[in-house]
């Protein structure tokens, strides 16, 4: 979007078609009437709904419906398994969608990877696809699995990985509950883990890591080339990234004797680039900053001991850098 201002008749406002800024609105063409989103059904579903709500795009969905509703008239979408999203984005059924990097790679999907969104079902970190065997297995390396059977949902990626290791083995598709297939139904498995707890619970041992993966937003190439759709995708990305950046942050504001600011800043390295404002008492200042929420319990007592008053901690919904 570019905005030019000036005297009436000398300036103009240009908006990507279909966007609204303040009271200005340019209707979308029929071609770009709705941005069709592919949302992940299954393990990522609840985390995705929460993220969209924090980003300002609440998604309403009944328990039996795969057709979500949005309060933004420019959006439409469907819930579908994350394994399939990239394929449908490539083929143009969805303009964009959220899926895992692993499934983009598995499907060899020809899509635009717009951004990473580092969140998952249970944590705010990347997941890993790992090669596992039973704790008592004699297997120590991938080479020890030559001629053996490996079960996984990520078949093509696993086959390519073993080929790169120079190992010939049988890779078979698993419909789920992959951890229980060793040792009776398979010699090893390739499975995804966030924390490693399920691997330990099933008495498995990691032999190697195939890849790291996280959620990504991908776009159809034609949709990305459409100015109106691209602008809407970029708006969604900005807000999603802002919500993710803010999830472990809080705002902190307090009043402080001006003479103590340098000392307080030195004692609290994370208190960098704070906003400092004058107060009616020239000897005092108001300080406002953003910190990691997990540091607040250490910061606030330190600030109080340094003479700070009126300390307020408040939640942050979005943080846009």
Language model feature labels by segment:
Residues 6-11, 18, 22:
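Residue-identity detector for glycine
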Residues 16-75, 79, 99-115, 119-128, ...:
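Small-molecule-sensing regulatory modules
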Residues 133:
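Acidic, glycine- and histidine-enriched catalytic cores of nucleic acid- and nucleotide-handling enzymes
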Residues 76-93:
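Short, structured active-site "lid" loops
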